């Protein structure tokens, strides 16, 4: 009897479950604000309507405020959901509002975009 196939299947399942067990959440609260897995501050944009499923920040706006991108297989978790952008890519949303990074933030914990033009805010 060939024992390779069951062994290979067992190994594959073990690796899959190990990966799931160590998966990090897409974002978490740290220092009183929402940050991504790298510790970079996440922001919301006042022109985005909560629950609309759309981002109003595209083109040049998205160059300065990069969307917090979600993987194709990303699943909602808690207050985090996923919206589909105009270009078909997926973006994380917090309480229904798309979330973004700020290009001028250079290291984890930076929050230099808070209240930028009175329309960008850190997520608290």
Each language-model region and where it sits:
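Compact beta-sheet-dominated domain cores in extracellular/mature segments
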Residues: 2, 20-124
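Bacterial N-terminal signal peptides
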Residues: 10-18
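Bacterial N-terminal signal peptides that target proteins for export
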Residues: 1-9
């Amino acid at each position: 009897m060939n024992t390779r196939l069951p062994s290979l299947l067992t190994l594959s399942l073990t690796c899959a479950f190990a990966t799931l067990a160590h998966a990090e959440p897409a974002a978490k609260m740290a220092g009183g604000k929402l940050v991504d897995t790298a510790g970079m501050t996440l922001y919301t944009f006042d022109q985005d309507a909560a629950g609309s499923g759309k981002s109003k920040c595209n083109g040049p706006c998205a160059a300065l405020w990069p969307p917090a991108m979600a993987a194709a297989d990303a699943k909602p978790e808690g207050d985090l959901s996923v919206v589909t952008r105009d270009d078909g890519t997926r973006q994380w949303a917090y309480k229904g509002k798309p979330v973004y990074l700020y290009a001028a933030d250079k290291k984890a914990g930076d929050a230099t975009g808070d209240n930028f033009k009175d329309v960008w805010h850190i997520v608290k």
